[in-house]
Amino acid sequence: MEGAAGRGHAGVTDTRLMSIVHEVSGTASYQAGASPVPAVGGRRLPFLDRARIYACGITPYDVTHLGHAAAFVWIDALTSTLRFLGIEPEVCRNITDVDDVLDEAARRAGTPYDSFAAVQQYHFEQDMAALGVRAPVHGPRAHRYVQQVIRLAAGLLDGGAAYAREGSVYFRGQAAPGRAGLERAEALRLSAEYGGRPDDPAKEDPLDVAVWQASEPGHPAWDSPWGAGRPGWHAECAAMALSVFGVGVDVHAGGKDLRFPHHAYHAAMAETFTGVTPYARAWLHVGTVTTGGAKMAKSAGNLVLVRDLLAGYPAAAVRLMILDRGWADDWDYRPDLLDAAAARLERLYSAAGRWAADDDVTGIGRLLAADLNVPAAIDYAIETGGAPARMLATVLGLS
């Protein structure tokens, strides 16, 4: 937190308390077989020693805002919790650098799309590092997986789950809304909102989606058996996940707004291609962050930027503001929430500095294993003090 020197409230940056918290070295506090079985989304997930986590990354066309950050801080909390429980997380966080929105942003900037994407990715990674979010083990970029998408398209065609028309390959998606519990009308609305082109006349059904999209003049394109084109959004993620992890993952994580259409089609394509179900043992759909009751959007002028938050508060306070609630909960950002988080962080640090007769940290493990119940874990740590408070601060990246 000293990296945020001069940016936080005095109590939050107390160096004595910081040194107390840092007395905890490492997070592996359980012997093999002794740790509680973690649960995500109410689903118990027994592990031996490794967890495969696919995190839907950014489309690098703009600055990182709080809505983005919330998802990645929660994913970081999940991976740290697993590590604390003796399970090594293997995280794959992709970069969607082949996308219509990115292409349009690069055109407006007068910059080649790949150079534009690389610069935005750099800024994103700087913001994540400033928030204390660990870098993933794997960081695939979509443009490097074009051949894998072509193989995916060919396999779906061979199985009759897709069809080729006018240089594109479409996945039959009528069943996809059911994966998200949606009626057809709502699925069509979301498909249009997220660039699914339900009005494309080449489709057999408006809910079909492009695995391979025929090229348009002046847009990025690659050769394929169906002509020049580019990967579809959902197919990119499916191809990257299957390439990195094989037939499936333990946890697929991302913002709740990605549940449909993106995650539903990604999983459907993966399961259809491999024949293995389920593609994901559990889903971590992080709640949406709004401001003034509205979804953050550049067009609305209401973005809350990570870099602006970190100019006034230490990263630990921003992380605690994000984490001190249920991970699936939607919430509305207000500046006073940061003040409340900073005050709660001071109480946690004070508790960490107290002597406590009981240095057993397993209570923290049980609470975090129970679907990442961070609020209850913080309450317990503040009440108990000592080693549990120090350990929790370490696990949640609040030290």
Regions found by a protein language model. Give the residues of each.
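Short, glycine/charge-rich beta-strand/loop segments that flank catalytic centers
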Residues: 95-100, 124, 134-149, 166-175
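Basic, alpha-helical terminal appendages of large translation-related enzymes
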Residues: 1-46, 105, 112, 116, ...
